[in-house]
Amino acid sequence: MNAVPHLGVLALQGAFREHRQRLEALGVRVTEVRRPGDLAGLQGLILPGGESTTIARLMTDFGLWQPVRDFHAAGGALWGTCAGAILLAREVLGGPPQFGGHQASLALMDLSVRRNAFGRQVDSFRVPLAVRGLAAPFPAVFIRAPVIERVGEGVDVLARHQGQIVLARQGRLLASAFHPELTPDPRLHALFLEMSLTVSA
């Protein structure tokens, strides 16, 4: 009998409960990650949408930066959605002025991401998004979304909106500018589950 897949969701701030619900609907055991010890035994970790500067500060407070890097180095998959994509990126553009334009990140994925590229919260929108590998469009919800302005050679672009990159994969890393957890469509969570099981096998 196969073991139940075990994934984590960073649960410091943002839409972590919605991610948990999507994963549990796929039969996944889910741990809410708040401290380094919570990473033990996980096959993948989702960095949710929220406020990237707040999540970054809390990651510092809870000592999570290096443990998450180590988790990935040991074979764990990572998926950043919206603010989480910012935290994965090697380069963050448009950082908060109060921090001199600097935005802390894990710097694991060869991307340049611009914060809040799609505007303010009142500019939120939902579009049917053509995603490479999916037979039908995905209902993508954008809320003050970032945009991926540059990708490195090892990064696969999976989706664009109005010509701008909004979903990309680099090995065991997945970054989405939108919020897949805010729709009942399970296909991207299923993709991340497959990534997590493949890399940890």
UniProtKB/Swiss-Prot annotation:
Q: Name the InterPro entries on file.
A: Class_I_gatase-like, PdxT/SNO, PdxT/SNO_CS
Cellular component (GO) terms are:
cytosol; glutaminase complex
- Positions annotated to bind L-glutamine: 50-52, 115, 143-144
According to its UniProt entry, the protein's GO biological process terms are:
glutamine catabolic process; pyridoxal phosphate biosynthetic process; pyridoxine metabolic process
Active-site residues, as the UniProt record annotates them: 82, 179, 181
What the entry lists under Pfam families is as follows: SNO
**Keyword tags:** Glutamine amidotransferase, Hydrolase, Lyase, Pyridoxal phosphate
Keyword set includes Repeat = no
GO terms for MF: glutaminase activity; pyridoxal 5'-phosphate synthase (glutamine hydrolysing) activity
What does the record give as its pathway? Cofactor biosynthesis; pyridoxal 5'-phosphate biosynthesis
- Can you state the subunit structure given in the record? In the presence of PdxS, forms a dodecamer of heterodimers. Only shows activity in the heterodimer.
Q: What does this protein do?
A: Catalyzes the hydrolysis of glutamine to glutamate and ammonia as part of the biosynthesis of pyridoxal 5'-phosphate. The resulting ammonia molecule is channeled to the active site of PdxS.
User: Per the similarity annotation, which family is this?
Assistant: Belongs to the glutaminase PdxT/SNO family.
Record-linked PANTHER family: PYRIDOXAL 5'-PHOSPHATE SYNTHASE SUBUNIT SNO, PYRIDOXAL 5'-PHOSPHATE SYNTHASE SUBUNIT SNO1-RELATED
Q: What is this protein's record name?
A: Pyridoxal 5'-phosphate synthase subunit PdxT
- Tell me what organism the protein belongs to: Deinococcus geothermalis (strain DSM 11300 / CIP 105573 / AG-3a)
